[in-house]
């Protein structure tokens, strides 16, 4: 009988793992968030948000590294939460993670749609705020239709689009540095470092935006079974990729700040285009705008495809609604899961960009990030004999830093975003009680 390989090859070393992680982290984010982060703190001091965000990401990265090496395999957060809380409410924790993901995932995709259309308004200035929302909604509908028609063009050139994005980031940095004005780049407002409520509130908002841009620092944990010496490589890959991406984004911020007054940046909805317009002229600004739109759409298309797989996988494993595990009979993809994520994305596209970003992160914090931090402590307490190839350095200090950091971000996200996240979670608990009762009773469709 032919021997079948039942495990993945561990071929990713530190350099490959770091590059892979950075590849998933670098994206459209800074092109749409630089005005928001500058506005949050009122000047170049917004760089502090990047520094605090990097510290939180590195600390939380150790939580992910320990969980992924002690609970290897597919599933990610919903497996970590299920196992960590299994003595208490593991199934509920896993369900709530998928439930909150049905909100946070579409919000993240919607931020790309809205940001992309805002850049289009540089080419077509007649697009007002209402038009932008309607057009972003229409782009969402168009993307669902593309998925249903199994258009593979965007998926086939994902790597190419990512390279174009890197080139776009690189060109933006290069143009900024070659037109550098120190006075503009470091024009701090009077009394900017006064420890006041305004400073703390602004730092919280800036850190939230920085964390939105750094999301993905944990993606290498999903490839743990393909990493050489994961106990060594995974935590170091997270740290190196966070530092690397933070430096890229910080230099990009400084490059743009050096060419435009920060007050003008804070008001812009297509800041990179405005920078090119001022330094190289409208012709080159339009070319950059088109590059940003193309790469933004490529990334959001891929996100909708990949994010629709998580509810599908959870449903197939029996931890979510059974109907989300249905596969299209002819085109062979999880169409109900895709429709759900797609429709939620279209609705989310009708809101303001700053609210979308705040809600996309705040809705994940309670269950996923804080839940995993507490869950790691519970696993150590309840299963001390479990094999842990990687153990958090200086435990529990990174856990404490990450917990305080995410709590700070959550409280800084604004009452509207907090309210949406909390209400969505409460609704999820009520639906779970009903679903779990039907599921255990064997009712079809549960």
Identify the function of each model-found stretch.
Residues 117, 131-183, 197, 215, ...:
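Membrane-interface loop-to-helix entry segments
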């Amino acid at each position: 009988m032919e021997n079948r390989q039942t495990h993945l090859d561990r071929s990713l070393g530190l350099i490959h793992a770091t590059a892979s992680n950075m590849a998933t982290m670098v994206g459209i984010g800074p092109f749409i968030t630089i005005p928001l982060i500058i506005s949050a703190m009122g000047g170049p001091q917004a760089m502090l948000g990047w520094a605090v965000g990097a510290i939180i990401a590195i600390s939380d990265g150790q939580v992910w590294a320990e969980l992924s090496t002690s609970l290897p395999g597919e599933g990610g957060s919903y497996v970590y939460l299920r196992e960590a809380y299994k003595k208490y409410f593991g199934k509920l924790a896993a369900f709530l993670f998928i439930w909150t993901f049905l909100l946070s995932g579409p919000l993240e995709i919607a931020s790309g749609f809205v940001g992309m259309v805002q850049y289009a308004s540089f080419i077509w200035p007649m697009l007002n705020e209402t038009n932008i929302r309607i057009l972003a909604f229409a782009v969402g509908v168009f993307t669902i239709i593309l998925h249903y028609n199994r258009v593979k063009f965007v998926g086939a050139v994902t790597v190419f689009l990512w390279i174009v994005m890197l080139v776009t980031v690189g060109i933006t940095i290069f143009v900024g540095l070659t037109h550098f004005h120190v006075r503009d780049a470091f024009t701090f407002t009077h009394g900017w470092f006064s420890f006041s409520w305004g400073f703390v509130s602004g730092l919280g908002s800036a850190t939230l935006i920085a964390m939105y841009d750094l999301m993905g620092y944990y993606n290498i944990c999903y490839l743990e079974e393909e990493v050489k010496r994961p106990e060594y490589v995974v935590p170091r890959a997270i740290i190196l990729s966070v530092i690397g991406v933070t430096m890229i984004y910080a230099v990009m911020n400084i490059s743009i700040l050096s060419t435009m007054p920060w007050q003008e940046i804070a008001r812009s909805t297509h800041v990179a285009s405005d920078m090119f317009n001022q330094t190289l002229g409208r012709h080159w600004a339009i070319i950059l705008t088109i590059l940003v739109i193309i790469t933004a759409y490529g990334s959001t298309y891929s996100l909708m495809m990949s994010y629709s797989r998580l509810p599908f996988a959870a449903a197939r494993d029996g931890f979510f609604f059974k109907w989300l595990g249905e596969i299209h009979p002819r085109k062979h993809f999880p169409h109900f899961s895709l429709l759900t994520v797609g429709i939620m994305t279209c609705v989310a596209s009708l809101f303001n960009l700053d609210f979308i970003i705040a809600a996309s992160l705040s809705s994940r914090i309670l269950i996923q990030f804080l839940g995993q931090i507490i869950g790691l402590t519970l696993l150590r307490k309840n299963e001390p004999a479990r094999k842990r190839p990687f153990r958090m350095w200086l435990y529990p200090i990174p856990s404490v830093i990450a917990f305080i950091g995410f709590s700070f971000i959550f409280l800084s996200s604004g009452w509207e975003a907090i309210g949406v996240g909390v209400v969505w979670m409460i609704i999820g608990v009520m639906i779970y009680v009903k679903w779990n009762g039907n599921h255990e009773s064997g009712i079809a469709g549960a």
